């Protein structure tokens, strides 16, 4: 456990607290997948360091991935132009993303900020994963239910 806050939203957890939050958030996320806060907490409390480290290393070994890790761009209402995306031709990723956000009446900013990751190098990996998760749903044509979310996780 990190005894001190490593970043603004960081909530350091003792090992027992992490386990209990993981179990509780998983139970809540399964019974009510609309609880994005619990889905996020489950993902963070069950994310094991070696998995995040493997993703980080893979990103670092790729030219574009390395650039992402250096620049740390975010996907938010501030960085995307939703009106422009909505005007894109049908069949484009941007148009699919716009339709996805509209259909769910949501926005990129609705995703919770990472709180329970105790490693600064893994912080961006988890945040980026969370912000790009919708693209996986779109590419795999998966619904935003438990089965669709699980399928997207495996992908």
UniProtKB/Swiss-Prot annotation:
GO CC, any one term: mitochondrion
Domain of life (superkingdom): Eukaryota
Thylakoid among keywords: no
GO BP, sorted A to Z: ubiquinone biosynthetic process
Coiled-coil spans in chain: none
Keyword Zinc-finger listed: no
UniProtKB keywords: Ubiquinone biosynthesis
Pfam families: Coq4
Family that this chain belongs to: Belongs to the COQ4 family.
Protein name per its UniProtKB record: Protein coq-4.2
The organism of origin for this protein: Caenorhabditis briggsae
């Amino acid at each position: 456990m990190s005894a001190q806050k490593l970043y603004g939203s960081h909530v350091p957890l003792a090992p027992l607290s992490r386990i209990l939050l993981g179990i509780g958030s998983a139970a809540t996320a399964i019974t009510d997948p609309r609880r994005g806060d619990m889905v996020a907490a489950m993902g963070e409390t069950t994310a094991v360091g070696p998995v995040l480290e493997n993703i980080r290393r893979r990103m670092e070994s790729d030219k574009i991935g390395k650039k992402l890790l250096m620049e740390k761009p975010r996907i938010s209402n501030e960085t995307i132009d939703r009106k422009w995306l909505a005007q894109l031709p049908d069949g484009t990723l941007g148009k699919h993303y716009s339709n996805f956000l509209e259909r769910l009446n949501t926005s990129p900013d609705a995703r919770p900020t990472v709180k329970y990751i105790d490693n600064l190098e893994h912080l961006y990996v988890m945040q980026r994963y969370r912000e790009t998760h919708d693209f996986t749903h779109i590419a795999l044509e998966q619904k935003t239910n438990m089965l669709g979310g699980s399928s997207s996780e495996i992908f």
